[in-house]
């Protein structure tokens, strides 16, 4: 299953000016997701907006939550299951 994840923090919790904190939090998210066995199809960031975006393939919501754990103290995450748009449109138009 494919999930779209948005993580948001604010300027008060932003670790950008503390390299050690960046390494311990957001710097650990991709390795942590990989450790959970998740496939990360893409990861993007909007630095001035304090937003991170991930597309992750997983069989387990719980594994995603565990994989995001290093960044949990920094803000909030929205984890949404999504499906292929073209495939959905084909199903809709064929029924």
Predicted region positions:
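Short hydrophobic/aromatic beta-strand micro-patches
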Residues: 8, 55-57
């Amino acid at each position: 299953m494919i999930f779209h994840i948005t993580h948001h923090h604010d300027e008060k919790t932003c670790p950008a000016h503390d390299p050690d904190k960046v390494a311990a939090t957001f710097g650990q998210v991709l390795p942590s997701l990989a450790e959970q066995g998740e496939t990360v199809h893409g990861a993007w960031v909007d630095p001035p907006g304090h937003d991170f975006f991930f597309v992750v393939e997983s069989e387990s919501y719980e594994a995603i939550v565990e994989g995001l754990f290093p960044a949990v103290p920094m803000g909030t995450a929205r984890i949404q299951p999504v499906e292929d748009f073209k495939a959905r449109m084909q199903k809709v138009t064929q029924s």
